[in-house]
């Protein structure tokens, strides 16, 4: 689709592409660029990862935002991985136009229910069933406060997942098992306008979908 534009919100800076989640994001960006889509990339900078000039080769715009890792993000009713990425600067940039938005993971979906984005095409890439992942972390953790955090985050993510499903137009799943899971969730929620679920294998140097 020549001359098309797309906002892509990444939970992390997708270069270097050195772990599964960012590999999927980076090679997806390359594939979109090669398809003639102008990607407006939004990504969150934290830990040791730094802005990467190479991303400008494949994106029309690249925006970086800090995560809010303070106690209010932990105590929020939203999951910490979501609330810490609820950047007002990000929302301001999303509201500059009316083009579709691709949210990478639940992490990036802080504003999916915002009424000002109600008429936008919203696509959510599910990298896994996030609340189950945190439940498994809780089971493996021995430190008391970490166990509490993982247990709370798992419950928050399960509730937040319902909100995301009810506001997304398209859900991209990464595996047949995840596809079956989200199809079952849709049956239980019985939404008036359910999102379309599309299985899209992880992107790599050979690309996905």
Language-model features, listed with the residues they occupy:
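N-terminal subdomain of nucleotide-sugar transferases
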Residues: 1-63
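Short, well-ordered alpha-helix to beta-strand connector turns
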Residues: 36, 59, 97-98, 119-120, ...
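A conserved catalytic-core segment of Leloir-type glycosyltransferases
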Residues: 41-93
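Short, charged/polar "capping" segments at the starts of alpha-helices
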Residues: 47-53, 110-112, 179-182
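Acceptor-binding helix/loop patch of EC 2.4 sugar-transfer enzymes
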Residues: 69-78, 122-159
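Short N-terminal targeting/anchoring amphipathic segment
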Residues: 92-110, 121-123
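Helix-loop-beta element that forms the nucleotide-linked donor phosphate-binding surface
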Residues: 116-120, 162-202
């Amino acid at each position: 689709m020549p001359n098309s534009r797309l906002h892509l919100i990444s939970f992390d800076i997708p270069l270097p592409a050195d772990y599964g989640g960012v590999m999927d994001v980076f090679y997806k960006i390359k594939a979109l660029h090669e398809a003639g889509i102008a990607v407006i990339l939004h990504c969150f900078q934290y830990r040791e990862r730094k802005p990467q000039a190479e991303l400008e080769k494949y994106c029309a715009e690249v925006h970086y935002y800090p995560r809010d890792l303070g106690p209010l993000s932990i105590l929020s009713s939203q999951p910490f991985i979501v609330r810490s990425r609820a950047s007002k600067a990000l929302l301001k940039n999303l509201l500059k136009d009316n083009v579709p938005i691709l949210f990478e993971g639940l992490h990036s979906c802080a504003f999916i229910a915002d009424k000002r984005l109600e008429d936008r095409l919203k696509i959510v890439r599910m990298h896994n069933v996030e609340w189950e992942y945190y439940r498994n972390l809780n089971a493996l953790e021995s430190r008391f406060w970490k166990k509490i955090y993982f247990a709370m985050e798992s419950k928050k993510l399960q509730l937040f997942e319902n909100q995301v499903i009810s506001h997304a137009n398209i859900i991209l799943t990464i595996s047949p098992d995840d596809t079956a899971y989200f199809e079952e969730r849709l049956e239980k929620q019985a939404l008036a306008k359910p999102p379309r679920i599309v299985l899209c294998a992880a992107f790599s140097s050979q690309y996905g979908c």
